[in-house]
């Protein structure tokens, strides 16, 4: 299967409610040309180095000079020095500089506007792209945000938090341990929503097919 066919298949599956888009940090970092234009947010490696430099945390490198220290590990050590609120505000401040300016990947996805998009990113690039396209997109940060949300309304599930709530982002080792417990409920609701969404789509297709066959039957002599 070539790339073009893969893209067509993916688009079909999204339209049919069989696939969910997941955006990792790579989606918000941007291409080389976009980075040259000053667009995109910091990569995890860049953010790791920024935290280490600002809070005086030593970094570890392998024999080839590659960074071994992780964002989670460095952030955890920084929190021991200055506290979680200070470190998280610093992280979001560095992220904000790249917010509000969607990249090509976000604008392309907004044209498709799948019902559910999931991400571990803190930024608002996809939501902004949806706004620019004149489309509504509800930001889901916790399970309570799903209450009363219409089934077919586009939503962005922010699995690790959002820049508008800096103190609640998942960043350190202890954050992720607690998140695993909290996320179980959200994941269960997402799965249920997906199953319901697929069932509704199938029911709609069945109704259309039944209507078509009924019309064909009535036309028969």
Language-model regions, residue ranges each:
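Conserved catalytic alpha/beta core of Sir2/sirtuin-type deacylases, generalized to analogous enzyme cores
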Residues: 1-19, 101-102, 107, 111-221
């Amino acid at each position: 299967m070539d790339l073009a066919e893969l893209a067509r298949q993916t688009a079909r599956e999204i339209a049919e409610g069989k696939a969910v888009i997941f955006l990792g940090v790579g989606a918000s970092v941007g291409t080389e040309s976009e980075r040259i234009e000053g667009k995109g947010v910091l990569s995890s490696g860049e953010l790791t180095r920024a935290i280490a430099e600002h809070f005086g945390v030593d970094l570890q490198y392998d024999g080839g000079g590659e960074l071994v220290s992780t964002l989670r590990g460095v952030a955890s050590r920084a929190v021991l020095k200055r506290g979680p609120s200070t470190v998280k505000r610093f992280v979001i401040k560095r992220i904000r500089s790249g917010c509000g300016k969607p990249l090509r990947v976000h604008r392309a996805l907004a044209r498709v506007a799948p019902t559910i998009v999931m991400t571990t990113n803190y930024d608002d690039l996809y939501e902004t792209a949806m706004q620019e396209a004149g489309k509504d997109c509800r930001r889901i940060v916790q399970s309570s945000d799903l209450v009363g949300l219409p089934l077919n309304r586009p939503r962005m599930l922010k699995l690790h938090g959002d820049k508008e709530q800096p103190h609640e982002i998942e960043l350190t080792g202890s954050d992720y341990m607690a998140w695993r417990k909290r996320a179980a409920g959200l994941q269960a609701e997402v799965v249920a929503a997906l199953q319901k969404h697929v069932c509704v789509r199938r029911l709609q297709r069945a109704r259309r097919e039944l209507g078509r066959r009924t019309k064909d039957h009535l036309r028969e002599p």
